Design a protein with these regions (language model features):
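An acidic- and aromatic-residue-enriched active-site/binding cleft used to recognize and process polar
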Residues: 33-35, 55-56, 80-82
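Long, compositionally biased stretches enriched for glycine and/or charged residues
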Residues: 69-356
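Beta-sheet entry/capping signal
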Residues: 26-28, 49-50, 76
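Rossmann-fold NAD(P)-binding glycine/threonine-rich loop
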Residues: 1-45
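Short acidic, glycine/serine/threonine-rich loops at helix termini
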Residues: 39-44, 63-64, 89-91
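A structural signal for short, well-ordered beta-strand segments and their strand-loop junctions
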Residues: 28-32, 52-54, 244
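Acidic, His- and aromatic-enriched active-site or binding-groove loops in soluble protein domains
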Residues: 48-64
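Soluble or luminal CAZymes and related metallo-dependent hydrolases
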Residues: 4-11, 56, 223, 291
Length: 356
């Protein structure tokens, strides 16, 4: 999260300014993670028309429909929050809210996530269905213990998968085997998605032989490619529709500023995105949302200043960290030992430090 944000924010802003200059009426549909934070940076520091997308909410919506045995189009989920920090607070089956039925049924709840993430009684206490990333807030000690037990990290496993993929693709393409190359890539996607959260939840591995089979990624009804096409189709006016996206709040969530980027349902039509006003956030999550948004603003400031002190402050504010000494230690490990005493080295600093 924070390391990628520090490296990526300056690049994203630079690219957005180029779009702003060359095609000011264009929409920038941003896939870049951390999606909410990057969209916030672009929105705050350029005039580019930007919308951030993430497949996490719609994946959860489809999992709920599948667990209910109902068509996805008959199930409407009321979702609110920030990117990687959102909750479903209503599940409407043909217009009737059945979230209490969903929360009461362990068999349904077991099907909502690829790995066993949450104690079901916690979900019932909150009366909310969180997205998978809330695991790192609600079970952070367990996540860390599992990562230590596995002796690996998700990033390290993805790097290993990517290296293997590149080698396999090169061999296939050198042999003019394009069909095999596509099959290789599909197998890579299945291994990557099938192992998602296994390490943090179970000390599992992307290379375990017993990974659950995954649907064909090229025919799946969800995923980045699907939501990207749907959002772009809506923005052209071809298929106006409602999607959960990362957009300016514009009063939709009363707890945050109008220019804060929120992850919320929005009506999308030709050249317009209108967020749907949400009911007040449940008190159990208001503080978490506000503190995470404060972290996003602080991380953007650090990314642009190049200051290690600014970066440590952002990590201190982050609700999953919240301590100065570990923040400084992690930053030193990621970018080298540097006590700048407030000196601002500029946005290129983080990329140079990471490369070094």
């Amino acid at each position: 999260g924070v390391a990628k944000a520090l490296r990526t924010v300056p690049v994203a802003i630079e690219q957005a300014r180029m779009i702003e200059r060359l095609s000011p009426d264009a929409w920038l549909v941003s896939f870049t993670n951390p999606a909410g934070l990057i969209t916030q940076a672009i929105s705050a520091h350029t005039r580019a028309r930007v919308v951030g997308i993430c497949d996490t909410p719609v994946e959860l919506f489809h999992n709920i429909a599948r667990a209910l045995g109902e068509p996805a189009e008959d199930v409407e989920c009321e979702y609110v929050g920030l990117n990687h920090l959102g909750w479903i607070r209503a599940v409407r089956l043909r217009g009737v809210d059945i979230i209490d039925r969903v929360l009461a049924d362990d068999a349904i709840l077991r099907q909502l996530y690829l790995a066993p993430l949450f104690d079901f009684d916690m979900l019932r206490a909150l009366r909310l269905i969180p997205t998978e990333y809330l695991y790192f807030f609600y079970e952070r000690r367990r996540a860390l213990d599992n990562q230590r037990a596995s002796g690996a990290s998700r990033g390290g496993e993805i790097e290993r998968l990517n290296r293997s993929l590149i080698g396999d693709l090169r061999s296939r393409l050198d042999a003019s085997d394009t069909t095999g190359a596509v099959q290789t890539y599909a197998a890579y996607l299945a291994q990557r998605s099938g192992s998602y959260m296994k390490l943090e939840a179970e000390a599992g591995s992307a290379f375990a032989p017993d990974l659950a089979p995954q649907p064909d990624p090229f025919r799946a009804s969800t995923g980045y490619h699907r939501i990207a096409v749907d959002v772009m189709s809506a923005l052209t006016g071809a298929r106006p529709s409602r999607h959960v996206v990362n957009v300016r709040n514009q009063g939709a969530m009363a707890e945050l500023a109008d220019d804060d980027i929120v992850e919320i349902a929005a009506d999308i039509d030709r050249d317009r995105i209108v967020p749907i006003p949400a009911a007040p956030l449940p008190s159990a999550v208001q503080g978490l949302v506000r503190s995470f948004k404060a972290y996003e603003h602080a991380a953007i400031e650090a990314a642009l200043s190049g200051s290690h002190l600014d970066a440590c402050k952002a990590m201190l504010i982050h609700p999953a960290i919240g301590e100065w000494s570990p923040s400084r230690r992690m930053l030193d490990e990621l970018f080298g030992h540097e006590h700048d005493d407030g000196h601002c080295a500029g946005p290129a600093h983080w990329r140079a430090q990471a490369a070094g």
